[in-house]
Amino acid sequence: MSLREKTISGAKWSAIATVIIIGLGLVQMTVLARIIDNHQFGLLTVSLVIIALADTLSDFGIANSIIQRKEISHLELTTLYWLNVGLGIVVCVAVFLLSDLIGDVLNNPDLAPLIKTLSLAFVVIPHGQQFRALMQKELEFNKIGMIETSAVLAGFTCTVVSAHFWPLAMTAILGYLVNSAVRTLLFGYFGRKIYRPGLHFSLASVAPNLRFGAWLTADSIINYLNTNLSTLVLARILGAGVAGGYNLAYNVAVVPPMKLNPIITRVLFPAFAKIQDDTEKLRVNFYKLLSVVGIINFPALLGLMVVSNNFVPLVFGEKWNSIIPVLQLLCVVGLLRSVGNPIGSLLMAKARVDISFKFNVFKTFLFIPAIVIGGQMAGAIGVTLGFLLVQIINTILSYFVMIKPVLGSSYRQYILSLWLPFYLSLPTLVVSYALGIVLKGQLALGMLLAVQIATGVLAFVVMIVLSRHPLVVEVKRQFCRSEKMKMLLRAG
């Protein structure tokens, strides 16, 4: 199978698995938002935000360093495996011991037992990380998809069932541990058919991996602050309940694109790595990737923005109506972040994550005051506006700081790659918004939302079918199995 065929096959398997995982995550979040109180929901979201940093530290970029290397020896793999395990134990102990201090700093001492319980995951998770990286390196996304879907389903079942009997944040924490255990066991079982770690350790042999991982980890930490500081600031200033509401909106508008984009970017990182020496080919494929990511995300986020006033009370309940303006602003944030995501794959493929790190450090100096001042002045809305302002600046500067040094001057291609998905999504935005105004009060809330979504989707489908843009035609051809279908979708 050629690299192109493997890449397309991998994207399809990743798409199926990721859509299922996102769907289960949204259902779980909706159930929890409805049956546990705002404070408990806030404690859950804040504890998961904190544990995300520990997760980044425990991996230390080792998994991606394995993928980036064209060739890697058994000694190097074994050393990296035991290094991962050791880091996991260190992170587990550190998080456990610091949990009370973290709760006090955030003015939420109830966080401590949740964080202590979550820390146990870091003894388990490292045993599966390397096997996942090896499967990804070989583009075996069918196995990865089945394993991750099974693990999420196990965690989802545990959380939802136990939450009905015990409506507390701890139920979701236990579900997370079940998810981690199942995921690690399955990756370990299938991964050992590829390779088995030995009892060897040579730190000198993995120096290149550690240098790559150090840059990647530093970049991830800065990116973590730029992503999650808003939740932590709100938790400290206004309490876990407000932070939970903000995070609920964030998980609807920003997190799905962050999880959907790896359908493409995780598959194309190893593919980019294989053509890292051909700048022209990289440039063409990168801008195609940018447009495809936009086509996936723009219509959904612009549509959500205009239906959010009906979506929130129907799905989460009226007790969360205060998050509607926050959700609308975060839809724009999510849209801008979605088109920034592929840049990471490009820089990793060229082993230039140092550029991303330096830029993210600069962005952090903008982000921290924007979030803190916004939170002090206008609460959740102020934090969201600060986030949006920094994201707009980030989108403008990304080309000059990160793309141009790697791909050369190509500003026109950058703008056109963003314009295409926006242009295709405009009818969805207009139709859904207009129907929301015209039919307000004439239909039940659920029916009105269904009509808005259905017509918005139809408008986007019509635009895709009618489009003769070369990239859109190329994408449509991937779904055509017959000449009749090609004619129907105008993909000939």
UniProtKB/Swiss-Prot annotation:
Give a GO cellular-component term: plasma membrane
**What GO terms in the biological process aspect are recorded for it?**
colanic acid biosynthetic process; lipopolysaccharide biosynthetic process
Question: Is Transmembrane helix among the key words of this record?
Answer: yes
Which pathway or pathways does this protein act in? Bacterial outer membrane biogenesis; lipopolysaccharide biosynthesis
Give its localization.
Cell inner membrane
Q: Which organism is it from?
A: Escherichia coli (strain K12)
Protein name in UniProt: Lipopolysaccharide biosynthesis protein WzxC
Q: Which InterPro entries match?
A: Poly_Biosynth_Transport, Polysacc_synth
The entry assigns this protein to a family as follows: Belongs to the polysaccharide synthase family.
**Membrane: is it a keyword of this entry?**
yes
Superkingdom as given in the UniProt entry: Bacteria
Instruction: Provide the alphabetized UniProt keywords.
Output: Cell inner membrane, Cell membrane, Lipopolysaccharide biosynthesis, Membrane, Transmembrane, Transmembrane helix
Q: Which segments does the topology annotation call Periplasmic?
A: 34-42, 103-104, 179-236, 310-322, 386, 439-445
